[in-house]
Amino acid sequence: MTIMRKNHPLLKIINHSFIDLPTPSNISSWWNFGSLLGICLMIQILTGLFLAMHYTSDTATAFSSVAHICRDVNYGWLIRYLHANGASMFFICLFIHVGRGIYYGSYMLSETWNIGIILFLTTMATAFVGYVLPWGQMSFWGATVITNLLSAIPYIGNTLVEWIWGGFSVDKATLNRFFAFHFILPFIIAAFALVHLLFLHETGSNNPSGLNSDSDKIPFHPYYTIKDLLGILLLLMILMILVLFFPDILGDPDNFTPANPLNTPAHIKPEWYFLFAYAILRSIPNKLGGVLALILSILILATFPLLNSSKQHGLIYRPITQVLFWVFIANLLILTWIGGQPVEYPFTTIGQIASILYFTIIIILMPIANMIENNILKLH
């Protein structure tokens, strides 16, 4: 078996990726989230496939087909809530994974990092089109508001919006194409994830110390397979607690009402994992400015390798940047909270301050902290 594992054309790839892969001996539990994202993607594809067998992407029957899945299909309620809450777990793992990359300086593996940003954007697109499918009030109005933002693009904006809608409003054509996108995108994510791994294994993993670990590597299996298995069990436990005890805690009550173009909900808001970006979008009074800020709130991650001038890898021995990092995380939580609040004082003001701080920390404060820390190093 050992010889076959190392010589067989297909098994050889699996062997070099998951079994005999030389891995730093000191990577902590923060490195578990990559494998957890893989598991989340598998759960989403499997549950999504079974949901697609019973779902109908027609404005007249979409809402009732979801109700039918929950009521009449064997374990349909379980599949549906695994899929809905699985998306939340996916994003929790995604945010922690990106946060770990920022904290430990993994962005210096620039190809892996850039593919990761593409993965992040693709996952956000998938979640957005997926949220439209149940055709509840928030699905419909969320789709209307967010797709309408494209009209802010000069000259081609309005044409682009109508092209995406497939008509003059969000209707049957929109729902149909969103279902098609939602079905295909996870497979594109899976393909990008393989490229992500390919680039990662080209350079080898980073580690908490930020030092070169070539002299101290251990095989991935059994050490990290067991460690990942523990993470997977914890993830599944949290997911099952959510699904079986609090299935609707992260959903919006408005989505239990069928979509009605004549009745606008009091507060239109996306799922919780988009609220930080939604708060940044709303904090700018100008439509085009808001759209640009929304896009930049994600694309700004690409500036991390460019703006980093530190002589050290990661933040483990950099107290000033460490403080900034945790202020950044707190600010992100504030933005998430603001995104779910109505557009009125004091929420708008807090949102504007938090949005400015979001960009200021990354573009101005962190590079300054880098220079200060480099100078402190020279003193010693």
UniProtKB/Swiss-Prot annotation:
<keyword id="KW-0349">Heme</keyword>
<dbReference type="GO" id="GO:0008121">
    <property type="term" value="F:ubiquinol-cytochrome-c reductase activity"/>
</dbReference>
<dbReference type="InterPro" id="IPR027387">
    <property type="entry name" value="Cytb/b6-like_sf"/>
</dbReference>
<feature type="transmembrane region" description="Helical">
    <location>
        <begin position="347"/>
        <end position="367"/>
    </location>
</feature>
<keyword id="KW-0408">Iron</keyword>
<feature type="transmembrane region" description="Helical">
    <location>
        <begin position="113"/>
        <end position="133"/>
    </location>
</feature>
<feature type="binding site" description="axial binding residue">
    <location>
        <position position="196"/>
    </location>
    <ligand>
        <name>heme b b566</name>
    </ligand>
</feature>
<dbReference type="InterPro" id="IPR048260">
    <property type="entry name" value="Cytochrome_b_C_euk/bac"/>
</dbReference>
<protein>
    <recommendedName>
        <fullName>Cytochrome b</fullName>
    </recommendedName>
</protein>
<keyword id="KW-0679">Respiratory chain</keyword>
<feature type="transmembrane region" description="Helical">
    <location>
        <begin position="288"/>
        <end position="308"/>
    </location>
</feature>
<keyword id="KW-0249">Electron transport</keyword>
<feature type="transmembrane region" description="Helical">
    <location>
        <begin position="33"/>
        <end position="53"/>
    </location>
</feature>
<dbReference type="GO" id="GO:0006122">
    <property type="term" value="P:mitochondrial electron transport, ubiquinol to cytochrome c"/>
</dbReference>
<feature type="binding site" description="axial binding residue">
    <location>
        <position position="97"/>
    </location>
    <ligand>
        <name>heme b b566</name>
    </ligand>
</feature>
<feature type="binding site" description="axial binding residue">
    <location>
        <position position="83"/>
    </location>
    <ligand>
        <name>heme b b562</name>
    </ligand>
</feature>
<comment type="function">
    <text>Component of the ubiquinol-cytochrome c reductase complex (complex III or cytochrome b-c1 complex) that is part of the mitochondrial respiratory chain. The b-c1 complex mediates electron transfer from ubiquinol to cytochrome c. Contributes to the generation of a proton gradient across the mitochondrial membrane that is then used for ATP synthesis.</text>
</comment>
<dbReference type="InterPro" id="IPR016174">
    <property type="entry name" value="Di-haem_cyt_TM"/>
</dbReference>
<dbReference type="InterPro" id="IPR036150">
    <property type="entry name" value="Cyt_b/b6_C_sf"/>
</dbReference>
<keyword id="KW-0830">Ubiquinone</keyword>
<keyword id="KW-0813">Transport</keyword>
<feature type="binding site">
    <location>
        <position position="201"/>
    </location>
    <ligand>
        <name>a ubiquinone</name>
    </ligand>
</feature>
<dbReference type="GO" id="GO:0045275">
    <property type="term" value="C:respiratory chain complex III"/>
</dbReference>
<feature type="transmembrane region" description="Helical">
    <location>
        <begin position="226"/>
        <end position="246"/>
    </location>
</feature>
<dbReference type="InterPro" id="IPR030689">
    <property type="entry name" value="Cytochrome_b"/>
</dbReference>
<feature type="transmembrane region" description="Helical">
    <location>
        <begin position="320"/>
        <end position="340"/>
    </location>
</feature>
<keyword id="KW-0479">Metal-binding</keyword>
<comment type="similarity">
    <text>Belongs to the cytochrome b family.</text>
</comment>
<dbReference type="InterPro" id="IPR005798">
    <property type="entry name" value="Cyt_b/b6_C"/>
</dbReference>
<dbReference type="Pfam" id="PF00032">
    <property type="entry name" value="Cytochrom_B_C"/>
</dbReference>
<dbReference type="GO" id="GO:0046872">
    <property type="term" value="F:metal ion binding"/>
</dbReference>
<feature type="transmembrane region" description="Helical">
    <location>
        <begin position="178"/>
        <end position="198"/>
    </location>
</feature>
<dbReference type="GO" id="GO:0005743">
    <property type="term" value="C:mitochondrial inner membrane"/>
</dbReference>
<comment type="subunit">
    <text>The cytochrome bc1 complex contains 11 subunits: 3 respiratory subunits (MT-CYB, CYC1 and UQCRFS1), 2 core proteins (UQCRC1 and UQCRC2) and 6 low-molecular weight proteins (UQCRH/QCR6, UQCRB/QCR7, UQCRQ/QCR8, UQCR10/QCR9, UQCR11/QCR10 and a cleavage product of UQCRFS1). This cytochrome bc1 complex then forms a dimer.</text>
</comment>
<dbReference type="Pfam" id="PF00033">
    <property type="entry name" value="Cytochrome_B"/>
</dbReference>
<keyword id="KW-0472">Membrane</keyword>
<keyword id="KW-1133">Transmembrane helix</keyword>
<feature type="transmembrane region" description="Helical">
    <location>
        <begin position="77"/>
        <end position="98"/>
    </location>
</feature>
<dbReference type="InterPro" id="IPR005797">
    <property type="entry name" value="Cyt_b/b6_N"/>
</dbReference>
<keyword id="KW-0496">Mitochondrion</keyword>
<keyword id="KW-0812">Transmembrane</keyword>
<feature type="binding site" description="axial binding residue">
    <location>
        <position position="182"/>
    </location>
    <ligand>
        <name>heme b b562</name>
    </ligand>
</feature>
